[in-house]
A protein has these predicted regions:
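A sequence-level detector of short, solvent-exposed, charge-rich linear segments
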Residues: 29-33, 40, 77-80, 84
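C-terminal structural segments of small proteins and small subunits
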Residues: 61-86
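Auxiliary, metal-adjacent structural segments of Zn-dependent hydrolase domains
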Residues: 1-33
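Active-site scaffold of zinc-dependent metalloenzymes
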Residues: 31-55
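Generic preference for well-ordered secondary structure
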Residues: 5, 21-24, 42-45, 49, ...
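Short, exposed beta-strand "edge-strand" segments with a Pro/Gly-rich flavor and a Y/T-containing core
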Residues: 15, 24, 51, 67-74
């Protein structure tokens, strides 16, 4: 699966879990951040660094969604395999 397809599937998964996904430029003086999960006014939000590579955005989004219980969520086989490998 290519990076664009994987990122798209991760974004769909996040939305199905009630997580808003935003792409914003993150300017951090001391180091680079690809983004991450936060909670704002009781709602989950993933902010992806729009200047990050697709690979870094995939990492940040995967790291966010694996915090949630995915056992009862239908995932395409390629996405489930990726997340299983990612969480190991």
């Amino acid at each position: 699966m290519d990076d664009n397809a994987l990122l798209g599937q991760l974004e769909e998964l996040a939305h199905s879990l009630g997580i808003e996904v935003r792409s914003e430029p993150i300017k951090k003086a001391s180091s680079f951040s690809p983004g991450g999960l936060c909670q704002l006014k009781g709602e989950y939000l993933v902010i992806l660094n729009s200047t990050a590579t697709k690979e870094d955005q995939i990492y940040a989004l995967a790291k966010a969604v694996i915090r949630f219980d995915l056992t009862q969520v239908y995932l395409r086989p390629g996405l489930r395999e990726f997340l299983d490998d990612f969480s190991d």
